[in-house]
Amino acid sequence: MGRLGYWTLLVLPALLVWHGPAQNAAAEKGTPALNIAVLLGHSHDVTERELRNLWGPEQATGLPLDVNVVALLMNRTDPKSLITHVCDLMSGARIHGLVFGDDTDQEAVAQMLDFISSQTFIPILGIHGGASMIMADKDPTSTFFQFGASIQQQATVMLKIMQDYDWHVFSLVTTIFPGYRDFISFIKTTVDNSFVGWDMQNVITLDTSFEDAKTQVQLKKIHSSVILLYCSKDEAVLILSEARSLGLTGYDFFWIVPSLVSGNTELIPKEFPSGLISVSYDDWDYSLEARVRDGLGILTTAASSMLEKFSYIPEAKASCYGQTEKPETPLHTLHQFMVNVTWDGKDLSFTEEGYQVHPRLVVIVLNKDREWEKVGKWENQTLSLRHAVWPRYKSFSDCEPDDNHLSIVTLEEAPFVIVEDIDPLTETCVRNTVPCRKFVKINNSTNEGMNVKKCCKGFCIDILKKLSRTVKFTYDLYLVTNGKHGKKVNNVWNGMIGEVVYQRAVMAVGSLTINEERSEVVDFSVPFVETGISVMVSRSNGTVSPSAFLEPFSASVWVMMFVMLLIVSAIAVFVFEYFSPVGYNRNLAKGKAPHGPSFTIGKAIWLLWGLVFNNSVPVQNPKGTTSKIMVSVWAFFAVIFLASYTANLAAFMIQEEFVDQVTGLSDKKFQRPHDYSPPFRFGTVPNGSTERNIRNNYPYMHQYMTKFNQRGVEDALVSLKTGKLDAFIYDAAVLNYKAGRDEGCKLVTIGSGYIFATTGYGIALQKGSPWKRQIDLALLQFVGDGEMEELETLWLTGICHNEKNEVMSSQLDIDNMAGVFYMLAAAMALSLITFIWEHLFYWKLRFCFTGVCSDRPGLLFSISRGIYSCIHGVHIEEKKKSPDFNLTGSQSNMLKLLRSAKNISNMSNMNSSRMDSPKRAADFIQRGSLIVDMVSDKGNLIYSDNRSFQGKDSIFGENMNELQTFVANRHKDSLSNYVFQGQHPLTLNESNPNTVEVAVSTESKGNSRPRQLWKKSMESLRQDSLNQNPVSQRDEKTAENRTHSLKSPRYLPEEVAHSDISETSSRATCHREPDNNKNHKTKDNFKRSMASKYPKDCSEVERTYVKTKASSPRDKIYTIDGEKEPSFHLDPPQFIENIVLPENVDFPDTYQDHNENFRKGDSTLPMNRNPLHNEDGLPNNDQYKLYAKHFTLKDKGSPHSEGSDRYRQNSTHCRSCLSNLPTYSGHFTMRSPFKCDACLRMGNLYDIDEDQMLQETGNPATREEAYQQDWSQNNALQFQKNKLKINRQHSYDNILDKPREIDLSRPSRSISLKDRERLLEGNLYGSLFSVPSSKLLGNKSSLFPQGLEDSKRSKSLLPDHTSDNPFLHTYGDDQRLVIGRCPSDPYKHSLPSQAVNDSYLRSSLRSTASYCSRDSRGHSDVYISEHVMPYAANKNNMYSTPRVLNSCSNRRVYKKMPSIESDV
């Protein structure tokens, strides 16, 4: 007691002096004061002043109370002295908390502090030494907290160490030290509930109070190399001493103890073996000053929380004496707020047992220098260890090392070594893998890091496992830290070679290449894999060439196809067809309809083109047998050609992958990379054998590639795929594996894995290692047994190697089809250029090409004429320019001829001389209007004076509003308003042979059609003469109307049902419905007054005259449905024929109809042969058979056998007027190259105006005389040597009426268009009109009061302006539509009537056309039927033939003439 009192007397004055002023200051401020005492042992190198200064104003900022720190240093820390010091301190300073630390390792200190806290309820923090030792059981009312870990926390770290190093087999040794049961229970519970394959072999509990013999007996039961020990430090000395005597502390044994055993790290008993592992509180990184500061912070934070919640803090204890045995527990204590505390950003919370929730534990090992070394750290429930492989320590000098346990280093490189993470569930390595440790850097600047447990597998790992079983050794495997194979840098080896050289590893296993430099420092086993240097490149998506669609065939094949085969075959087909007797160009077959379409070279090419590409295009098939055989062979060729093209097309339309072709390391791309643009980029992984080989053999190459070197293989593969690298040079075995396992198989090795500088992989061992021989023998055994081959198949073969020959199909993109689109775009551009050139040529240049500019024959005409001359051997004479024709173009010359016809006088001046007068029409325009009466079998010219007459109704009557109105329907000339009713019957006046007489009749024939000029044979224009008796009696017609034809009067008649349209025509062909037409009658819906049936501007005389013609027995009335919708449908023509023919009429065979049941009532008029010259001009060959072309709806059934007579000739004819010319023996199917003198003198530049070459008539004889002369000379039924005029071919002859009811046995021209069976829907020419027949006016003749206007003739079907469209008609034109003639009538003349009113008036005209006069009041349309008989002209005579575009009549212009060149 005296000693304690002396200590108290020395200490208390100082405490009072320090505490008094602070407490007074706190009282003055009114803030509560918190007194905390710090007691430490004198062994710590710290003073009391330093302890008080640990809490300064910085730490007290923001606290609601004043903190007073009382620091004391104790010399003795035995239990008695400890209790005395604490009680004296409480009595003198009235403290609220205590921070205690000592320098002992006695757990009794912690027990004493726990007792004091349970008695005084003052919170005590044990921060160091014995005060922080583990306590088994604390008092329930204890307020003692320790900076340490509980038994369970330390046991968890111990098991984690064994798990990381795969020490799954262990034994547990304990004493009866307090807490041992908790330790054993926790270990067993953890092992039983863990997925780790723990194997706890023994649990030994020792009682050290007995003799050592018993302890040895228990320790002998241990058979595991890992032992967990739980005891006090003094007991551990005894147990480890006995274990050493039993040999349990050598290389193969690992003792792991808690902090209770290690105690104070500065005190190390000599019995502790080297390599002893302990889990301890962190004294290395957690200093005593930091612990004191954290203790003060914990108490201050708890007091502040209590003050904030309860507004007070517990009253400080004044003394620990006089306490009851069981003190009363206060309602609120400070330690309740110490459980969850966060201070200075650290979680310093405590558990209910008084231990830290997150203690700072470390793993320490007693190294060979007998010092505790920190090798691991437990932080945030994570253990990090320094050593990849736990070092084997030689515990004592008498211990022998274990040479069978090897430390092996490896390198991650697939497929030889593949590193994976551990199983997250079991935290171990799965089957077929071995544990390996990998160093992971935490701080790159300081190279600080930790070794993490990984799992390794691969080709080399499987070899290692086989070697371990065969050679009998154990190993610890770890990955090299720098990830290199090994290179000597600054005379220091790195990588795996460095680990072996510096004996950190016994063996190096992996993709380690054997070379001379490495063999100098290490020993290599025999190679187990053959390898070398290879080059890897990446496949890049190639581009499809725009000409890929042409690549299935070579250029020569395409040339042969389109140039040689197509042209030659097309010419052959054309030639065979041209000279075939049954072809299109030879209409010689019996019963063959003449004037059919021609089979041209263009049609032949189009046919063959359609066959090659199997296009459904309209083509015209040949009819000749030879040409059909040729086409059949071509069709067979086309099948093979197209099939071959289709089969090969897919292979060329896919995107071909591009691969850089490299032949080897000496390739130009490696040696001279700058020669390429961009430069060739290649690299390798440095510090390897590949780099060394390149450096030694190719210095320039090595210097260039250093900037493209990669850190590893994976980085190189990424660079290849992203285009940063063009080639990667590396070990062949690795590259082959990567190429085989690459996703998408985009990486390939050159030459299918071609190897340069062949070498192998081997195992590196320390120089002079005893393991080399055993390992070499084992490897050779693996090779001999085939085990090595199995491993190579398992690991080194990739899936891409097995799929090399598989075809990978993909969707065709726009790149694949770009060439086709380019071709279409080029075609569009070429079409646009052609379109512009076509318009430029037509409007600007064609006149010069046709010779108009130079008045010389044009180029095209000259070529055509030259070809003809060469083929037929005909000499072509140059034509002299006619002085009478000085206009530009043949059409202008034709107009000039038409204008010269405007010299017709009125009735008073109507004589032969006046008719031939050259006066202009202006001289007669004031003398009255002209009405041409449509009188059957008579031509009466009836004239009346001009008078005003206002029509009561329009020609359309009540249905006028149903008609369509068009903007431009006529020609731009003023002639468009005049009626040209077609070709009229012509005879030659016997008194004046140079005079042509025209017969004007009202009967119009409906069954005619236009035809082409050059397609018609010359012989088809000849007709036989016939004899007939004059008949004057005819039956009267019924009141039914008949529909008239739409054909233009410009053409010769032809069969309606047999169109002249070629089967390859691209124009739409209009038909009428052939079905059920025989008895079809069109409904008359006009229902209008009589006045509405006639033109609005007809005079009374004209109207009266026309009305009187209705009762004529020879009239045929055309009707049309007036209430029909304006859809331009053509109704079938209806003929009302009530004509009674005289029985004595003789019909010659020459003009027999094709249908015996139709038109038998119409007699034909034989022409006088006397006016005809060149009587020997007509052919008499049997091959030419002529037919009358006047049959209509009902006359298509006549047999072809009833033909006309045959004629033959050996001379030729004039190409213009058809006059006979001698010395020609050619075919009449060919166009004659000669002309008569008249045509040569009067013709224009081109011989395409032959239809104007009519003789200028002289003074005619009277009508009766001419008629009698003609009639008397034609009774012999022989019309000989009659020549017909030639009409020009025009391009609007493709519109057909609805097919008449025909005899199906007589085939019509086939048409391949889809609209063959279609009605003429929507046609512009579907609206026709009904015209009543007028009664004859007797033989009263009235003359024309005015001349004919020349503008009646059109110079072209193509309008000069877009507004002058002849295909459109206006309402005004519809008002002026009249009935037109039937173009088939020129082939037939009706017998003249014997009645008074049945005489013809023959007028000498310049034109054979009939004209309807126009006065200044408007139009006076008259219904005209004209009959033009083909004739033959004398030599040196010129006849002007009509070329009529009658825009006033119901005839419409159907098609445009393409160009003048079509006639050439």
UniProtKB/Swiss-Prot annotation:
It is found in: Cell projection, Dendritic spine; Cell membrane; Synapse; Postsynaptic cell membrane. L-glutamate binds at residues 511, 513, 518, 689-690, 731. Component of N-methyl-D-aspartate (NMDA) receptors (NMDARs) that function as heterotetrameric, ligand-gated cation channels with high calcium permeability and voltage-dependent block by Mg(2+). NMDARs participate in synaptic plasticity for learning and memory formation by contributing to the slow phase of excitatory postsynaptic current, long-term synaptic potentiation, and learning. This is Glutamate receptor ionotropic, NMDA 2A. Detected in striatum. Detected in forbrain. Detected in cerebellum (at protein level). Detected in brain cortex, piriform cortex, hippocampus, caudate-putamen, dentate gyrus and granule cell layer. SMART domains: Lig_chan-Glu_bd, PBPe. The gene is Grin2a. Disruption phenotype: Mutant mice appear grossly normal and are fertile. NMDA channel currents are decreased in mutant brain slices. Contrary to wild-type, where tetanic stimulation leads to a strong long-term increase in synaptic strength, only modest long-term synaptic potentiation is seen in mutant mice. Mossy fiber granule cells from mutant mice present a decrease of the slow component of the excitatory postsynaptic current. The slow component of the excitatory postsynaptic current is nearly abolished in mossy fiber cells from mice lacking both Grin2a and Grin2c. Residues 601-615 dip into the membrane without crossing it. Disulfide bonds join 87-320, 429-455, 436-456, 745-800. Contains an N-terminal domain, a ligand-binding domain and a transmembrane domain. Agonist binding to the extracellular ligand-binding domains triggers channel gating. A hydrophobic region that gives rise to the prediction of a transmembrane span does not cross the membrane, but is part of a discontinuously helical region that dips into the membrane and is probably part of the pore and of the selectivity filter. It holds the Pfam family Lig_chan. The modification Phosphoserine is found at residues 882, 890, 929, 1025, 1059, 1062, 1198, 1291.
